[in-house]
C-alpha cells in the first residue's frame, strides 16, 4: 500500500476562502498544498468538482461506552462519525460509571485507543460530589470538564442549579467548563402543571413548554454572570432559544472569548412543528423549540454569537425512544448526518461553505486548544473529508451506521455526500468502504 496520497484539482475550503489546488499527504500530515500533479509514488484521488474540508471536530457526543453499549459503543459510533466526515470527537461524561475520576477518564482513553476509528477526547465529569477533587487537578491539561448528562442521576447535582458550586468551580478551574443549562426548578414546576392536567399521558408536543425558554434563559444568564465574575472559561452546550443568543458576544474573536456557546444540528433542522410527525423520536434535552427559535439560532450562528456546531449525538434503542413521553429517553443518533445537514443549508443559500468549516472545524480546535487539527495547513495532521455537493442520497435503515439502527432523519434526502474521510493521513472511509485496521489517537498528550 502506498503511504503517500495526492488529491488533485480539489476545491479546498479553509480559513474563509475556497482555493482549487492539489494536496499531498505523507507520514500522516499535510506535507504540501499547491501544484503537485501526477506522482507514481502516491495514491491518486481526482478531486475535480469536489470540495475538501478539514475533518469535522464534534465537540459533544455520547458514544455510550462503557456501560451503555446496547445503545452504541466507541467502534460503532466512530464508524458512523467518519462516514459523516467527523474525524475527531469529544465524548461526554455520563457513561457508566460516570467519568468523575481520573482513573475512569484514563480507562475511556484506553478503550478508545483500541476501538475508535476517529480521534478522541473526553470530558471529565463534575458534580457536587467530586468538585473538590476536580479543583485539585491540573485542569489546564484537560480538554474540559462538564456536567452534561450527569443530572440524570437525580441527585440535584446539575451544575446550573447550584450557584455556590458554580462559584467554587469557576473560581478555580482553568479549562473549559461545558454545562447543560436549564433551570430544573422551572422544569419541575412546568411538569407538575401538565401532569395535573394530563396525568401520565402528557403529549410530547408539550416537551418544549415543560423544558421551556424561560428555564433555559434564566439558567444561562445566571451562569454567564458568575463566570464573568471569575473570568472562567464557560461554554454553554446545545443552545436552543433565540432569547439566549442575545447573551453572547460577537464583537471579539473566539480566541479572546471566555464565554462561548454552540448549537446542535437538530436544533437547526427541526422545530416544534415536527413533534406531530416524529413524536418522541425528536425528544432531546434541552427541547427542540419554535420555528422562531430555530431561525434565531441560525442567525446567531451566522453572526458569530454562536461559536460551534455540534451534534449531541446520543443513541438509544428504538424501544427506549418509542415509550410514552415521560418514559422515553432523550437524545438520538445524528453524528453521521451533521455535515450533510449543514451542506443542505448551504444548498438552500442559508450558509456558506467557509462558515461551515469555521463552525465545525476551525472553532472547535480553537476553543478546546486542539493542536495541529481543524485547519488545512502544511504540517497539520491530515484529518480531512471530501464532499460531493451534487450526489443525492436518502437516509435509510440500510445506510445508518449507529448501533441503534434508526434515525429521526430516515426518509430525508440530502443533496450532498461525504465520499472520503482521512484520519491522521489514513483513508478510513472511501465511498461506503471502511479501513478499520487503523485507529484514531487521543486529542491530548
Show which residues each predicted segment covers:
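Divalent metal-coordination and catalytic microenvironments
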Residues: 10, 28, 49, 60, ...
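C-terminal cap of metal-dependent C-N hydrolases
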Residues: 10, 324, 378-444
Amino acid at each position: 500500500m502506498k503511504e503517500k496520497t495526492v488529491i488533485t484539482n480539489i476545491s479546498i475550503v479553509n480559513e474563509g476562502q475556497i482555493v482549487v489546488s492539489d494536496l499531498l499527504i505523507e507520514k500522516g500530515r499535510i506535507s504540501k498544498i499547491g501544484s503537485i500533479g501526477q506522482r507514481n509514488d502516491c495514491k491518486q484521488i481526482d478531486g475535480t468538482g469536489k470540495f475538501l474540508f478539514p475533518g469535522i471536530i464534534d465537540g459533544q457526543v455520547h458514544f455510550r461506552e462503557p456501560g451503555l453499549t446496547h445503545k452504541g459503543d466507541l467502534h460503532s459510533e466512530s464508524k458512523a462519525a467518519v462516514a459523516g466526515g467527523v474525524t475527531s470527537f469529544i465524548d461526554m461524561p455520563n457513561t457508566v460509571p460516570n467519568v468523575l475520576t481520573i482513573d475512569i477518564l484514563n480507562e475511556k482513553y484506553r478503550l478508545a485507543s483500541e476501538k475508535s476509528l476517529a480521534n478522541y477526547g473526553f470530558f471529565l465529569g463534575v458534580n457536587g460530589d467530586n468538585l473538590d477533587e476536580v479543583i485539585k487537578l491540573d485542569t489546564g491539561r484537560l480538554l474540559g470538564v462538564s456536567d452534561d448528562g450527569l443530572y440524570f442521576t437525580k441527585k440535584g447535582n446539575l451544575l446550573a442549579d447550584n450557584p455556590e458550586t458554580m462559584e467554587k468551580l469557576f473560581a478555580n478551574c482553568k479549562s473549559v467548563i461545558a454545562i447543560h443549562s436549564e433551570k430544573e426548578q422551572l422544569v419541575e414546576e412546568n411538569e407538575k402543571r401538565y401532569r395535573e392536567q394530563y396525568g401520565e399521558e402528557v403529549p410530547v408536543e408539550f416537551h418544549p413548554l415543560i423544558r421551556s425558554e424561560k428555564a433555559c434563559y434564566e439558567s444561562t444568564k445566571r451562569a454567564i454572570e458568575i463566570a464573568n465574575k471569575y473570568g472562567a472559561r464557560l461554554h454553554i452546550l446545545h443552545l436552543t432559544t433565540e432569547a439566549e443568543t442575545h447573551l453572547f458576544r460577537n464583537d471579539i474573536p473566539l480566541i479572546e472569548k471566555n464565554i462561548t456557546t454552540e448549537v446542535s444540528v437538530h436544533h437547526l433542522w427541526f422545530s416544534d412543528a415536527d413533534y406531530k410527525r416524529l413524536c418522541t423520536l425528536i425528544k432531546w434535552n434541552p427541547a427542540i423549540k419554535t420555528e422562531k427559535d430555530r431561525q434565531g439560532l441560525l442567525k446567531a450562528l451566522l453572526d458569530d454569537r454562536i461559536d460551534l456546531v455540534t451534534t449531541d449525538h446520543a443513541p438509544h434503542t428504538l424501544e427506549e425512544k418509542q415509550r410514552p413521553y415521560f418514559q422515553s429517553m432523550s437524545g438520538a443518533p445524528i453524528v453521521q448526518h451533521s455535515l450533510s445537514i449543514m451542506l443542505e443549508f448551504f444548498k438552500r443559500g442559508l450558509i456558506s461553505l467557509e462558515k461551515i468549516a469555521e463552525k465545525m472545524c476551525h472553532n472547535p480546535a480553537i476553543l478546546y486548544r486542539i493542536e495541529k487539527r481543524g485547519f488545512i495547513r502544511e504540517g497539520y495532521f491530515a484529518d480531512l473529508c471530501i464532499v460531493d455537493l451534487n450526489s443525492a442520497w436518502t437516509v435509510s435503515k440500510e445506510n445508518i451506521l449507529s448501533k441503534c439502527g434508526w434515525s429521526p432523519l430516515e426518509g430525508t434526502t440530502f443533496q450532498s455526500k461525504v465520499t472520503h474521510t482521512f484520519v491522521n493521513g489514513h483513508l478510513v472511509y472511501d465511498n461506503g468502504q471502511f479501513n478499520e485496521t487503523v485507529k484514531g489517537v487521543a486529542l491530548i498528550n
